Design a protein with these regions (language model features):
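Gram-negative outer-membrane beta-barrel transporters
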Residues: 3-94
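Conserved C-terminal beta-signal and adjacent last beta-strands/turns
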Residues: 54-182
Length: 182
């Protein structure tokens, strides 16, 4: 049985900058970046066998996003969006020799690891068909996570560390949709 406790006191500081640019009705661009620092006042002992850490877990120092929308003709809209998530410290629980003997995961100690950073890019195209005066039928399609920015080192098996998950929530995905507005 594992019990989790809140950590000791902490200091979080940061800055967020955002901006938006538009050219007529054809082009819009919005972007933002957050720079932050999160530290415990005293080193936090998250596992009996791992070194204590002052840096907070799962809090990247840098995060950013952008959205660009282009409307070359009135019924067609093309949107490009991206999210940057900087490297962050994450916990990875130990796998005991007993659990490793089951053959699913090798034995390892509890460690705090720095993740890679991720850039997640997506694109969507939408075309509106207008019916009557106020009904719009939209067809859309796109790709999410074009560059397959996704965690590569998941634990596997019944004794995996189910909390060892970081990065974008979904792998590369293709989608299509229909929207009716009235």
């Amino acid at each position: 049985v594992r019990t989790r406790y809140n950590g000791p006191g902490a200091k979080v500081m940061g800055l967020t900058l955002e901006g938006k640019l538009a050219y007529l009705t054809q082009f819009q661009f919005q972007a933002g970046v957050t720079l932050q620092r999160s530290r415990y006042d005293e080193p936090y002992q998250w596992d009996d066998d791992a070194p204590a850490e002052k840096k907070m877990f799962r809090t990247p120092n840098t995060y950013g996003y952008f959205t660009a929308t282009y409307t070359p003709i009135k019924p067609l809209t093309i949107a490009l969006s991206g999210t940057y998530t900087g490297s962050m410290l994450v916990q990875r629980a130990a796998i005991s020799a007993e659990n490793a003997a089951m053959g699913e995961m090798p034995e390892r100690p509890a460690v705090a690891l720095m993740t890679p950073d991720f850039f997640d890019l997506g694109i969507k195209a939408a075309y509106d068909f207008k019916f009557c005066k106020s009904t719009v039928f939209q067809l859309n399609a796109g790709i999410q996570n074009i560059f397959q920015a996704y965690q590569k080192d998941f634990d596997r098996g019944a004794n995996r560390d189910s909390n060892y998950i970081y990065g974008p929530a979904t792998p590369r995905s293709f989608f299509a949709g229909v929207k009716i507005s009235y």
